[in-house]
Amino acid sequence: MLLLHEIHTVAGRREDEFEAAFRDGWMATLAKDDDARLLYFLRLAHGTGRAYHLVTITALRDGNAYERLATRVQRGDLRSWAADVDKLRHEVAGKILLPVEWSPMHDIDLATVPTDGRTHEPVLYMEDSAWPHEAMLDQYLEKARTHYAPSLEQQTERSLLTLLGVFQAALGAARRREVVLWQRVDFPERLPALFTRELPAHVKGPGTWMHDALEVRDDWQSRLLRSASWSPLG
């Protein structure tokens, strides 16, 4: 399975049209065969970063499915759709992600992904993009497997997230050493404490992820992303 991760800088006045294009066009068209499915349609929460940044994540069965989809956008039935969508956004930045071997989200049965636009309560996600130190990609991934992932399974008064997926940039990406941690925010009411108070010493001292991970990375970015009510996987 491959993931097509795209960040769209949308024209503010055309935001609703852009959303409709993905719901009624992209999602519905991909549902006609077994190559790909839209998994998520998300907004960067206002007040946490650039305005009108929307994120879409599309799953592709394999490399052949990616080639077929790319060809459809380049010169096939999705060419006119892509041209219309370009009128609704200023820019789009995309990358292909691969799940790491131990990622909870690894192989998705695309046939089970909803494509009918059924609605649900919006879900909040935290997407952490980390860039390990030079030549330390494998060491970062191993430390994330043995340290970070188990730490999220420990339920405490500070628990916030559930780890849903761990992905790395595919060959040819602009930044090879990139890892994406895809997490659901289970306790949104605990976010203010994260923003308004310094982390206590006991969660950033030796033996903690915040401390020990500095051996392999000190550069990462977090995004708070809210799903649309019709986003297929919530």
What kind of region is each of these model predictions?
Residues 2:
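Acidic/histidine-rich, surface-exposed loop or edge segments in extracytoplasmic proteins
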Residues 5-14, 101-186, 229-234:
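Surface-exposed interaction/gating patches
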Residues 16-41, 46-51, 59-100, 146-162, ...:
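An amphipathic, aromatic/His-enriched active-site/gating alpha helix that lines ligand/cofactor pockets
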